[in-house]
Amino acid sequence: YKAYETGQLMHGLTRMVRTGESYIEATKDAVDSYLCTDGRPVSTTTSRYGGDKNMYGQFRDRDYRLYLTICPPYMVKKENGPSTADWKYTDNAQDREFIDLMATISGETYHRLPSSNFKGFTVQGQPHFKNMNWGQGWNASQMGFWVWKYYNTHTVATNANGVNTTDAPLFRIGEVMVNYAEAMCELNKFDQAAADKSINKLRARANVAKMVVNDINDAFDPKRDPSVPALLWEVRRERRVELMGEGFRLDDLRRWKKGDYVNKQPLGAY
């Protein structure tokens, strides 16, 4: 990893995420790529996933990596104006579903809901649109899926840009495991043992059922690119979600000769 130190080498990423300057967001296609907790895609799951007509249902029973990468939906009351830290629960139980969940799977100073901007002002809800923002221009997106993978509240962020000192991973074990899985699949050597050494270790911490190699066939995901074998499609999916927001996707699409994927019409939360 790359170490940062106050007064020596600093950066501005974790502050930027909590400002109106951030334009990092995801598409519906990216959100749909995350599996449900039963290890099935959204097209064939039997979990409590509720479809894409309601964002609470859309995020329900999903891979925890989705919640830690793209801010889950919530809503709170702001009774003293937008530029304050105070908040209260609404009378709708759904509005706190993911507030409660994130309190159990995250730390005190990262990925807790409701989110706040760099000055500590509580954001009223997600999805939070740049053009419809309750007077709060921060932590917002154009299409409703705000990426907050690098969000935390323990980094100094209130006074100036470029003073953050959170260290930056350069090569982490998750990348090693998805590299191994893809290489084994391309060599036609990806079996259950290979899955257990790689993908299933990643899924264990993401609250997703294990990959069972023999269960993956052409019917596993009806929305699969038909030119990609079913097992390779699932291995590539795992790589996509594990490394989401870390700068790998475009190079991967070039390597796979799948540049046409970027021509899809981007869709948002609604």
Predicted segments, located by residue:
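Acidic/polar-rich alpha-helix caps and helix-coil junctions
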Residues: 1-270
